[in-house]
Amino acid sequence: MASWRMLCFVLLFTSILICHDARPLPSSLSSSNGSPAFVESVKQVVKEIMRRKQLLGTQYSTNRLSPSGPDPHHH
């Protein structure tokens, strides 16, 4: 019974230490919504990435041929 109490005490004590050891986030980072300017710039970047992907996707093709069988010198 004493070992059970000691185990509970150790677990409780370590959980208290862990909770007090953590650093709280600044209020600007803890808010769920970002600033409107940041969100707008992210939207513009994503649009530009999608536009470039579409441009490259229509022109890009691989000319590489895969080998027809195992390399005889490999094994």
UniProtKB/Swiss-Prot annotation:
Q: Where is the PTM Hydroxyproline found along the chain?
A: 67, 70
Q: Which GO terms describe its molecular function?
A: receptor serine/threonine kinase binding
Cross-referenced InterPro entries: CLE1-4
Keyword field = Glycoprotein, Hydroxylation, Secreted, Signal
Q: Does the keyword Glycoprotein apply?
A: yes
Can you cite an annotated GO cellular component? extracellular region
Asked if ATP-binding is a keyword of the record, the answer is no
Signal peptide from the UniProt entry:
1-22
User: Where are the annotated glycans?
Assistant: 70
> What family name appears in the similarity comment?
Belongs to the CLV3/ESR signal peptide family.
Additional comment:
Roots of plants overexpressing CLE33 exhibit normal growth, but reduced levels of colonization by arbuscular mycorrhizal (AM) fungi.
Q: What is this protein called?
A: CLAVATA3/ESR (CLE)-related protein 33
What organism, scientifically named, is this protein from?
A: Medicago truncatula
Q: Which gene encodes it?
A: CLE33
